[in-house]
């Protein structure tokens, strides 16, 4: 079985290869999200939804930056970045995406000790030459970052300008059942009520899937 450190290393290397203009700040942000997901509690789901709608509206009128060709980008620890620029053709409702995000933020905690251990994995990758960043530059960044109390941070200007990142960090279980959520939302376009039957052998996850649907939709189980 792959260790947590090895999994994180794979994630870091994949992202650096996929986004070669990643800076140290962007890698640290990736490690932070691997530990804390969105990094904050969502007290008001409606305000979160309004921000999501505004961001997607801005994306629709923005032709700059590289466009993602995948809906989800794995960030390890059972989490993904759901990339907003890639969802228009899927038919998924923004209310559904927002609920993915809210549920994930409310269920993930993380801790600073674990974050520091994961930053050590990042440091080891730089020391080994697996990532194109000088260990001394990383250490200087982390020294200042630690002094600030390890807050959630934004992407670097280089990353923002080239990749125009717009995403929500969500639990990977939503990726695993994304086709089902898209199908449900498509049905809700034409009818007020959707009945879903989950037919599978005992112990195959019917109860877990039912609970997941109940967390996303206002429904009876």
Regions found by a protein language model. Give the residues of each.
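Post-Walker A helix-loop "phosphate-sensing" segment adjacent to the P-loop in P-loop NTPases
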Residues: 214-221
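Hydrophobic positions on the alpha1 helix immediately C-terminal to the Walker A/P-loop
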Residues: 209, 213
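Conserved lysine of the Walker
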Residues: 206
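Charged/polar, solvent-exposed surface patches and flexible loops
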Residues: 99, 182-186, 215
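Long, basic/Gly/Ser/Thr-rich N-terminal segments
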Residues: 1-159
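N-terminal pre-Walker A segment at the start of P-loop NTPase domains
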Residues: 162-189
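Pre-Walker A (Motif I) flank of P-loop NTPase domains
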Residues: 191-196
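P-loop (Walker A) phosphate-binding loop of NTP-binding proteins
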Residues: 201
């Amino acid at each position: 079985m792959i260790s947590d450190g090895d999994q994180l290393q794979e994630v870091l290397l994949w992202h650096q290869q996929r986004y070669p203009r990643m800076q140290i700040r962007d890698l640290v942000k990736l490690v932070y999200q691997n530990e804390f997901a969105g990094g904050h509690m969502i007290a008001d789901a409606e305000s979160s939804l309004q921000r999501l709608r505004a961001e997607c509206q801005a994306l629709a009128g923005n032709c700059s930056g590289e466009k993602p060709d995948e809906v989800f980008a794995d960030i390890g620890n059972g989490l993904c970045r759901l990339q907003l620029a890639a969802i228009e053709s899927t038919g998924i409702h923004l209310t559904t995406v927002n609920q993915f995000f809210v549920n994930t933020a409310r269920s993930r905690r993380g801790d600073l000790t674990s974050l520091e251990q994961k930053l050590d994995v990042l440091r080891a990758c730089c020391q080994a030459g697996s990532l194109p960043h000088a260990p001394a530059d990383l250490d200087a960044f982390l020294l200042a970052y630690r002094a600030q109390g390890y807050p959630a941070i934004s992407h670097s200007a280089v990353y923002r300008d080239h990749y125009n990142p717009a995403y929500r960090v969500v639990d990977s279980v939503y990726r695993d059942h994304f086709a089902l959520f898209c199908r449900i939302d498509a049905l809700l376009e034409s009818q007020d009520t959707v009945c879903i039957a989950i037919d599978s052998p005992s112990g195959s996850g019917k109860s877990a899937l039912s609970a997941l649907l109940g967390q996303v939709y206002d429904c009876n189980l």
